[in-house]
């Protein structure tokens, strides 16, 4: 048996191709059942996210091409469409690849933690479809523990490397407990949505969403339990906000110095933290002149991100060493499983020989043969049959002049070294 990792990701395939190769919730169970029904495939897990689709299989040697052909058939793809984007890893490299993916070392954003949850969900699907057991089950459990160790023993996830995460991280520098703050989000696009998710992870429950169109803001508000307002209503509510994070496509500033100054007076000059992620700016630069307003722009965040990315790169180097160590540990276990099968088969074969010769000896005794002669014959035949295969191997190695194999056979048979 062999382990296989086969797939495409953001480094090898366009978004258009990744969309065509993806496995959605509506087809994942059927796909798993079909995959494990392929000749030689005993286990399978399918990991499918926006940035990658990967098939992990335990299968007979040389069956990787069959898995690739199944993938093409399932999605109705021509070989020419995927051949340049597909990568395949076997055994040690397949193990290393999965562990790196689980740790976020192969992600578009180095060290991002979301991929681990996605892999766990994929593994759960495989369990529900009874598509995973044995070696592949052990590999995924091992990969989860490796990812946890990397998170614990390195700083791979300690620093913000996205604009949204950096904005929230800056807020924590000013307000140690974000759960006690009220946040105004200006805009309702993808970046603001990601900011809202990070805020929720920090237990922020008081959010306001201001947007040019209320429909999009309401969708965001429903998900995060936020209050909704138009951009024109911001002056009426700005004083309630401890934190303001803005990201719109407005060509002109939405929040001016005078508006913030009035809000600070209403707050009795309690500090206000503002992050302007937009280009061009949503918040007038002069706001930074106010003593109780702390304004950061996307340029400030970029500097933090670049500094943090260097920290993550150093942590990633440490993580790679952990992955290598854990891969070797898993492969030691995996190879030992092959010896378990071999030992079982060898014992079964030897037991069959012993049973046959025992029955032959008992029959001889029943027919009146002398007991001593019957036992001597039993010992002679049993010895000859049990040493036949090793003897043939020794003769073949000697005939080939293979001294290395002869030494290995001598050690295996427990023979003392030649004088």
Swiss-Prot record:
GO terms for biological process: protoporphyrinogen IX biosynthetic process from glutamate. It catalyses: (S)-4-amino-5-oxopentanoate + tRNA(Glu) + NADP(+) = L-glutamyl-tRNA(Glu) + NADPH + H(+). InterPro entries: 4pyrrol_synth_GluRdtase, 4pyrrol_synth_GluRdtase_dimer, 4pyrrol_synth_GluRdtase_N, GluRdtase_CS, GluRdtase_dimer_dom_sf, GluRdtase_N_sf, NAD(P)-bd_dom_sf, Shikm_DH/Glu-tRNA_Rdtase. Keywords: NADP, Oxidoreductase, Porphyrin biosynthesis. One of its GO terms (molecular function) is NADP binding. Substrate binds at residues 49-52, 107, 112-114, 118. PROSITE patterns: GLUTR. Pfam families: GlutR_dimer, GlutR_N, Shikimate_DH. NADP(+) binds at residues 187-192. The active site is at residue 50. The record marks 97 as: Important for activity. It comes from the Bacteria. The keyword Oxidoreductase applies. Belongs to the glutamyl-tRNA reductase family. Homodimer. HAMAP family: Glu_tRNA_reductase. Catalyzes the NADPH-dependent reduction of glutamyl-tRNA(Glu) to glutamate 1-semialdehyde (GSA). Possesses an unusual extended V-shaped dimeric structure with each monomer consisting of three distinct domains arranged along a curved 'spinal' alpha-helix. The N-terminal catalytic domain specifically recognizes the glutamate moiety of the substrate. The second domain is the NADPH-binding domain, and the third C-terminal domain is responsible for dimerization. This is Glutamyl-tRNA reductase. It comes from Aeromonas hydrophila subsp. hydrophila (strain ATCC 7966 / DSM 30187 / BCRC 13018 / CCUG 14551 / JCM 1027 / KCTC 2358 / NCIMB 9240 / NCTC 8049). The lineage of its organism: Bacteria, Pseudomonadati, Pseudomonadota, Gammaproteobacteria, Aeromonadales. The gene is hemA.
């Amino acid at each position: 048996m062999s382990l296989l990792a086969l797939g495409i990701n953001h480094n090898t395939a366009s978004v258009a191709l990744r969309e065509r190769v993806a496995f959605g919730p509506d087809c994942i169970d059927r796909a798993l059942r079909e995959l494990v029904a392929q000749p030689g495939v005993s286990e399978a897990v399918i990991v499918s996210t926006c940035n990658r689709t990967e098939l992990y299989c335990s299968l007979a040697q040389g069956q990787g091409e069959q898995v690739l052909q199944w993938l093409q058939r399932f999605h109705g793809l021509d070989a020419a469409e995927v051949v340049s984007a597909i990568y395949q890893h076997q055994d040690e490299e397949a193990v290393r690849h999965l562990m790196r993916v689980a740790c976020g070392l192969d992600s578009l954003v180095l060290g991002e933690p979301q991929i681990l949850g996605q892999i766990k969900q994929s593994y759960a699907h495989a369990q529900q479809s009874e598509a995973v057991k044995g070696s592949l089950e052990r590999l995924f459990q091992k990969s989860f523990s490796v990812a946890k160790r990397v998170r614990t023993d390195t700083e791979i996830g300690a620093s913000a490397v996205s604009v949204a995460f950096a904005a929230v991280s800056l807020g924590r520098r000013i307000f140690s407990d974000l759960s006690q703050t009220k946040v105004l989000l200006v805009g309702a696009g993808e970046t603001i949505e990601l900011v809202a998710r990070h805020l929720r992870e920090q237990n922020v429950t008081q959010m306001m969403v201001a947007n040019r169109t209320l429909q999009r803001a309401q969708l965001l508000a429903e998900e995060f339990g936020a209050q909704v307002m138009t951009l024109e209503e911001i002056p009426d509510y700005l004083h309630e906000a401890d934190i303001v994070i803005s990201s719109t496509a407005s060509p002109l500033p939405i929040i001016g110095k005078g508006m913030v100054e009035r809000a600070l007076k209403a707050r009795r000059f309690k500090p206000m933290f503002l992050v302007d992620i937009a280009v061009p700016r949503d918040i007038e630069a002069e706001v930074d002149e106010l003593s109780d307003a702390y304004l950061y722009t996307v340029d400030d965040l970029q500097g933090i991100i670049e500094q943090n990315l260097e920290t993550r790169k150093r942590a990633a180097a440490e993580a790679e060493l952990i992955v290598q160590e854990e891969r070797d540990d898993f492969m030691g276990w995996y190879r030992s499983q092959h010896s378990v099968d071999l030992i079982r088969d060898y014992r079964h074969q030897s037991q069959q020989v012993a049973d046959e010769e025992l029955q032959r000896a008992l029959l001889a005794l029943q027919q009146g043969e002398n007991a001593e002669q019957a036992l001597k014959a039993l010992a002679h035949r049993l010895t000859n049959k049990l040493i036949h295969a090793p003897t043939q191997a020794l003769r073949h190695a000697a005939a080939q002049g293979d001294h290395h194999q002869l030494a290995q056979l001598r050690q295996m048979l427990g023979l003392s070294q030649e004088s």
